Amino acid sequence: MSERAPLVIIGTGLAGYNLAREWRKLDGETPLLMITADDGRSYSKPMLSTGFSKNKDADGLAMAEPGAMAEQLNARILTHTRVTGIDPGHQRIWIGEEEVRYRDLVLAWGAEPIRVPVEGDAQDALYPINDLEDYARFRQAAAGKRRVLLLGAGLIGCEFANDLSSGGYQLDVVAPCEQVMPGLLHPAAAKAVQAGLEGLGVRFHLGPVLASLKKAGEGLEAHLSDGEVIPCDLVVSAVGLRPRTELAFAAGLAVNRGIVVDRSLRTSHANIYALGDCAEVDGLNLLYVMPLMACARALAQTLAGNPSQVAYGPMPVTVKTPACPLVVSPPPRGMDGQWLVEGSGTDLKVLCRDTAGRVIGYALTGAAVNEKLALNKELPGLMA
């Protein structure tokens, strides 16, 4: 009698491990194989942008070793292992020359940092921080240094600016935009967040891009496209993430911005699912924890034999910028409204109302974040 094919989950980040936990509550017997390109330690990715202010190294942010996770989940976990191919027609994957069969396959391999082309002889001093191993490398490089240039003024860029500044570093932020968190924040809220970070000593250079990075004595010189030269010791790249889709595309799965899945988290091929940062769920690619958790619960049910679809209710995002606390909930797609700004300084309530006067989105800064629970009750779901 042949051995049962396992559920295979590629990825051991928040998406992979949370799905495995939820599924094991429903099915304790079916074999489970998890495969990861990194070291397999369990950690919370959002905590990567809090490590310096809390003075935590990578080991301090890790919550469990892969061996402990394997025991907890009754799973086999392959670390530092790259899947090289997917064969949907025969329900198998390839790890080099090794064939691994699956009952169901879940792609939870996340997103990768967007790489920016930079001239100069110091490109090795440019660090993305997208996982625990990236964080460990950067923290080692940052030891004894003080001047950090940060590329990107989006959500993650602002969180790292707050964290590194609170951790004692001198921060310069460079981004080719007119405000922080463009596309996410109303300009008034963006101005409040920027003011809060400037209060920590963060310097913003909005508009230009980093043209070249050159070694200069014991440090570096960052040459911006507008001619400004900023002395620094190392550079953090936080210009954004791109869902990993290449392997899925090569296997014939439908991809768009992310791997295309329906509300059951099913891809265009039977028995293959995706969730987390790599997935585009019914047209939405949301790189946040709340949607991921909702998807993990729904997919666990489906994989346990109880077909389920995910629904997104209101999903406000709490941004970790203590210099100016921020909670934001953009209006759902297809909904338009008028923005109104109340408050002053860094304490703003910025509401978006539709033509009937209903609140469909908000940005709350400073003391106004205390109103989030009341406002959340008024919000429409992102994907009902």
From Swiss-Prot:
Pathway connected to this protein: Hydrocarbon metabolism; alkane degradation
Record's keyword terms, sorted: Cytoplasm, FAD, Flavoprotein, NAD, Oxidoreductase
The protein's Enzyme Commission number: 1.18.1.1
Statement: the UniProt record of this protein carries the keyword Calcium: no
Gene Ontology BP term (one): alkane catabolic process
Major subcellular location class: cytoplasm
Cofactor (UniProt): FAD
Pfam families xref list: Pyr_redox_2, Rbx_binding
Protein name: Rubredoxin-NAD(+) reductase
Biological source species: Pseudomonas aeruginosa (strain ATCC 15692 / DSM 22644 / CIP 104116 / JCM 14847 / LMG 12228 / 1C / PRS 101 / PAO1)
Phylogenetic lineage: Bacteria, Pseudomonadati, Pseudomonadota, Gammaproteobacteria, Pseudomonadales
